[in-house]
Curated annotation (Swiss-Prot):
It catalyses: a 4-hydroxy-3-(all-trans-polyprenyl)benzoate + H(+) = a 2-(all-trans-polyprenyl)phenol + CO2. InterPro entries: UbiD, UbiD-like_C, UbiD-like_N, UbiD_bacteria, UbiD_Rift_dom. Mn(2+) binds at N172, E238. GO terms for cellular component: cytosol; plasma membrane. Pathway: Cofactor biosynthesis; ubiquinone biosynthesis. This is 3-octaprenyl-4-hydroxybenzoate carboxy-lyase. One of its GO terms (biological process) is ubiquinone biosynthetic process. Belongs to the UbiD family. Binds 1 prenylated FMN per subunit.
Amino acid sequence: MQYRDLRDFIRGLEQRGELKRIQVPISPVLEMTEVCDRTLRAKGPALLFEKPTGFDIPVLGNLFGTPERVAMGMGAESVSELREIGKLLAFLKEPEPPKGLKDAWSKLPIFKKVVSMAPKVVKDAVCQEVVVEGDDVDLGTLPIQHCWPGDVAPLITWGLTVTRGPNKDRQNLGIYRQQVIGRNKVIMRWLSHRGGALDYREWCEKNPGQPFPVAVALGADPATILGAVTPVPDTLSEYAFAGLLRGNRTELVKCRGSNLQVPATAEIILEGVIHPGEMAPEGPYGDHTGYYNEVDSFPVFTVERITHRQKPIYHSTYTGRPPDEPAILGVALNEVFVPILQKQFPEITDFYLPPEGCSYRMAVVTMKKQYPGHAKRVMLGVWSFLRQFMYTKFVIVTDDDINARDWNDVIWAITTRMDPKRDTVMIDNTPIDYLDFASPVSGLGSKMGLDATHKWPGETTREWGRVIVKDEAVTRRIDELWDQLGID
């Protein structure tokens, strides 16, 4: 089922028993985090806090707190269906030439559907039903969460940031956390390689000293939100991809103060600029690692205008030691990644990002090994093929007889098929998440690959061990006798 906007999604969740309305007053300061954390760990519903303490605007939390709700937001009926979305993205990322006329005709509907999902620009939009400008702008009217005791200030977490570099037709969508530092100012914490930061850098080079337009959408429809965190090919805009997920074109509206286009059905829009050179120290904040991060300087976003729907809903989350929403998103999007990786590396049988590895810091790959050194090729491919994995610190590669999602299997493979010196690959001076305080230099560190595959001639001179396999006939006989044995 597809959802036109966030409210449509809320209704759909409520009909399925996947959303709970909270009538008891709960504070955005620490209390919502506690409630959402307990609910997420219990695999509970999305939460709509209708009476946040001190505010008139309800808060939506734990929206993507289960993989099943992530799948619903992407228009799928089950998590397993996300593999089909991954296959579509794999095809769009590297479309193969048709093998003949019949093949060309079979692929034509896919391209026609992609072309037909170009965003639709509208003149009037519900996200601009109410307009607040100038001195009336006050972020303090929004129930922005203060998530952890050591957090320095309230933090906008689910803001969909819209930017466009100079001479670019395509807008960039990214989700960057934003520290509130005044009634109309937040710190835009984007890393140097992210799309928003690249757009800003190019703008400063081409338009020195000129303010850089930015917009932030809060409470967009689920397909647009999830499109911003999915590995969409560079040839496809996030808005068009959201249209494919939703089954109809994404409606956009031009901002009141710039040429940026924002989701027309979003709940709240922040419009404004970044003045080149205006920076501020950001943090500390508790983040998805389970620790407070160090303080660092990032650009300041000045909010010149807030537009919103009548009676808006504020969409929020928290990040902390897994499990949290980013970890759950990682579990669901894992199914999207598998076909994309298999398109480039057909020998891969499964790919798994353990949620306890902070969503992306460790990957386990199983493969059909075909030659000596094959595992190392796959390791390097994982690190380089998708930008989502440039911060993955550990890649474990093993054979397809191992269940990548079962640590009992994985640890057995590591301890029996690896020699630490021969089978460990170390790569130094590579990009690392700025939030990773374990790296010796901020943003720069090392990576480790573990080859836990059976070794081939050329990789070892010794006779390799054979896996013990039970006798099937004996297993069947004991199955038949088991109840008579009275053991359980």
